Amino acid sequence: MAPCGRVRSRCPGPALLLLLALAARPALAGPPAAALQAGPGLNAAGQPAQGAAPGAAGPRGARGGGGGSGGGWKLSEEAVCREDVVRLCSKHSWANNLAVLECLQDVREPDNEISSDCNHLLWNYKLNLTTDPKFESVAREVCKSTIAEIKECADEPVGKGFLVSCLVDHRGNITEYQCHQYITKMTAIIFSDYRLICGFMDDCKADINLLKCGSIRPGEKDAHSQGEVVACLEKGLVKEAEENDPRVQVSDQCKKAILRVAELSSDDFHLDRHLYFACRDDRERFCENTQAGEGRVYKCLFNHKFEESMSEKCRDALTTRQKLIAQDYKVSYSLAKSCKSDLKKYRCNVENLPRSREARLSYLLMCLESAVHRGRQVSSECQGEMLDYRRMLMEDFSLSPEIILSCRGEIEHHCSGLHRKGRTLHCLMKVVRGEKGNVGLNCQQALQTLIQETDPGADYRIDRALNEACESVIQTACKHIRSGDPMILSCLMEHLYTEKMVEDCEHRLLELQYFISRDWKLDVVLYRKCQGDASRLCHTHGWNETSELMPPGAVFSCLYRHAYRTEEQGRRLSRECRAEVQRILHQRAMDVKLDPALQDKCMIDLGKWCSEKTETGQELECLQDHLDDLVSDCRDIVGNLTELESEDIQIEALLMRACEPIIQTFCHEVADNQIDSGDLMECLIQNKHQKEMNEKCAIGVTHFQLVQMKDFRFSYKFKMACKEDVLKLCPNIKKKVDVVICLSTTVRNDTLQDAKEHRVSLKCRKQLRVEELEMTEDIRLEPELYEACKSDIKNYCQNVPYGNAQIIECLKEIKKQLSTRCHQKVFKLQETEMMDPELDYTLMRVCKQMIKRFCPEADSKNMLQCLKQNKNSEVMDPKCKQMITKRQITQNTDYRLNPVLRKACKADIPKFCQNILNRAKDDTELEGQVISCLKLKYADQRLSPDCEDQIRVIIQESALDYRLDPQLQMHCSEEISSLCAEEAAAQEQTGQVEECLKVNLLKIKTEMCKKEVLNMLKESKADIFVDPVLHTACALDIKHHCAAIPPGRGRQMSCLMEALEDKRVRLQPECKKRLNDRIEMWSYAAKVAPAEGFSDLAMQVMTSPSKNYILSVITVGICVLFLIGLMCGRITKRVTRELKDR
């Protein structure tokens, strides 16, 4: 090159060279012979040049050269180099000095060392080539048209030797083939030694000494291989950025010189001498067919950098060059060339920015990505280059000085030894996610910045670790999506936790999504569909701009707040944006770490309550379970998310996946609606116990129901239907169960009082009914009952499933064994269910078809009454009949559990059974005492007609099934077990047990049991219908002899007794036998149980076999008394009239 003084006067330092961008690898053939044959210290004619440096002519005896064609001086004929040339260079190149020079300076060291004298000769030859003005004439001849086009070079003074320097400086703009070849060869010569680079020595002398990059004088190192010094300075520049150590700082002038040298060598890897020597073998191994020039060899080597067979020294050299590219994009020839017009078009290199900032690769990528995301057109060549370098940054963390600077501790502690193919970055991501320890805020910010720079959300292939881990999943689950499409990531998220997902892909995907979820711009599809809405509603700025008022993480929160607004609330999202917001919400529901706000506010609570919940989706469920225990900020976030889920349960992606079969079968209509509004969850709840329902779905639906109980806002439809009623009638009540109780109590009171206008609105009453029915299915949905009975459930119903109200049914069946508090709650529940049988989940489930058959139009409150009336129908389902009997048994334990009886006997109960009521407790059964009392009064025929009708039915039913008589069952349990075990074990009860007890009356020892059996006998006298065995035996006789006599009040029984005494009447043998048995029983009963009143006495007389004799005696007695009265007159003293009239 020309003397540096002239060049630096035009443009200080190596800044003169800023315009170079492109070059092609030189051909082996050199420029015109005159230039190529000139030797050190010689002119073009081969004569010694004036002013040649001492020793320029080379060693003694080598002057005047000859031996070349045309008699020109040849390097190959110099004695000091002849042996090296013959040994190292092919014979056809000996005649060409530049070819020999290229051969010798590309020698593999230290395998084939060149002699010291030859090295010195080469140095002087190269120095002359770069400083001798006589070479200018060759350049003017070869580059005539190029010089005319480049004004700066045309203006250089003639004969001063500055022209070659100028042409090297503008090599990228040279299009003339021969000129380009000549100048490229000159550049290769210059770049072989830093001292030959114009200005480099002056700019970097102090830095070379500071960084100890080697001697600046020829000596220990070969004079022509001083490219190692430049490599050392490059490493110093890189180290400065990575360590931020004030003791190791490269001066600004030298920094510019280093980057300019790297830029000038960007087109041909031969020009980076250190990299060339380090990677020659690897070039042959990996890039043998790659033509040199335009940075192609560099790119090829970059692509193979992490191959196992890549040498370590080459990998280090490539990494250093990549780090320089990261500091100045112009060090990449292909990137600078492909993106030149786009950078200018989108003002990515405006003058007012600091040079160090706009030159950074990250700034270029961010600026051009911003244009792409705004929908601007960036050339495909430039986008291709951007993709390559984004992939490069993701592949090797060491190319990002911020990562090394901020994450050094995390790398050493958690990620050592994972330097290849992006594994270190993913390891750091894993640490940030909290899976391998804690991470500093600076490291997290550096990672977030790198993810924004590389933008892997736009193309998954940028993340090599993810690409390799997920290749099989993409080929199977996402093969319908074009390779590189941003929707690939969404597709992978949709298949997260499915059988198609592989574990390694799952980890890499979640690690990347953690960062994408923290900056809405990194989700390309979301940004594309929502940038208008975000600008309008959330006041966001450009893609690569940030705002303190609206940080990236807050934008999505703003969007989803608007996504679920009603039309009345206004300012809603566009349909496309809303769909994307829902997609993101679905993804976030899979992992709590994908929701930045949730993880930030709930970090302490997650550690406190959910440290053991590591399975998919368990952390959010755990937070919901402990909602009342969470700190305020976390509780608000979880509450808002749960409220959102109640409106659109499809956000719960894992639940939706588990429930897919049931949705397709039973809920496809509501699932297809774009606006959910809680319909889908309601449908799932209603079909929770279908046989198609799988366990995962049922558990998920039940869990959501349990969460809903914590706050009525979590039931979207209930909230929307009743929020005004709640504010008016139930203020300050939060829990759903309390709101339901408050509203249902209000509705019941208004109904009982026949209020003209209900205080609870019609739409709320309808939804309230839905909520009440849903709560009956699982005891956990009734928190007060569940809390009261927890210990009893553990003791008695431990293996019983919660669903289908099975626990509630279990508690009902063992009611007598329950703790007092639980017993009371169960009694209250039964009282409610008997008043409104539709709330009896088990009854409604078991008898669903029978209700459709027998009670399609029955009011819900009369449902059980209707079923009881049809219980003995031939087409009644046995299971339903059994369930009706169970409810009848329950009703007969206490009149309060039989609303119809309670209403019919409203006046009779306090009149006849007050003493029992006085002993009664509100929450404890009377064990049938009131009903037994009413039965006795029924026998005395003293009840009101309505009450009598109800008691008759109860007597008839209990006569067929002893279990319907709680007093009998309680007092005669031992007798039934010992005397009537076979009858009690019968599947169908038809009065056999009662008959057995009557027959064995004499064997009964227990007084209370005997009394109950005697009461049965007494009841049977009142009406034959209450004695099923006798009624069955005498059915034909009643039809023949007593058809005209209406039933009731013992009339048909008296008719049969008269027929038995009438000799003219022949009764059926069975009937006659049963009647005689009854008479004997009644006779014994009369002896054992004396009449308690006149009515009992009269009944005993009427049913006695000596009825006529007794009546005759009574009549005679009365007549005798009458006659005595007539004959004996007054017994009292007579009184005079005067005394009477006083």
Swiss-Prot record:
Residues 1-29 form the signal peptide. It is found in: Golgi apparatus membrane; Golgi outpost; Cytoplasm, Cytoskeleton, Microtubule organizing center. Residues 1130-1142 are cytoplasmic. One of its GO terms (cellular component) is extracellular matrix. Glycans are attached at residues 128, 173, 544, 640, 749. Residues 30-1108 are extracellular. The chain crosses the membrane at residues 1109-1129. Pfam families: Cys_rich_FGFR (PF00839). It is a single-pass type I membrane protein. GO terms for biological process: bone morphogenesis; negative regulation of protein processing; negative regulation of transforming growth factor beta receptor signaling pathway; protein processing; regulation of chondrocyte differentiation; transforming growth factor beta receptor signaling pathway. Residues 45-69 are annotated as: Disordered. Cys-rich GLG1 repeats lie at residues 81-112, 113-175, 178-241, 249-309, 310-376, 377-436, 438-500, 501-567, 572-631, 633-691, 692-751, 759-819, 821-874, 875-942, 943-998, 1004-1064. Residues 45-60 have a biased composition (Low complexity). InterPro entries: Cys-rich_GLG1_repeat (IPR001893), Cys-rich_GLG1_repeat_euk (IPR017873), GLG1 (IPR039728). Fucosylation is essential for binding to E-selectin. N-glycosylated. Contains sialic acid residues. Its main location: Golgi. Keywords: Cytoplasm, Cytoskeleton, Glycoprotein, Golgi apparatus, Membrane, Repeat, Sialic acid, Signal, Transmembrane, Transmembrane helix. Binds fibroblast growth factor and E-selectin (cell-adhesion lectin on endothelial cells mediating the binding of neutrophils). Binds fibroblast growth factor (FGF). May be involved in intracellular FGF trafficking and the regulation of cellular responses to FGFS. This is Golgi apparatus protein 1. The lineage of its organism: Eukaryota, Metazoa, Chordata, Craniata, Vertebrata.
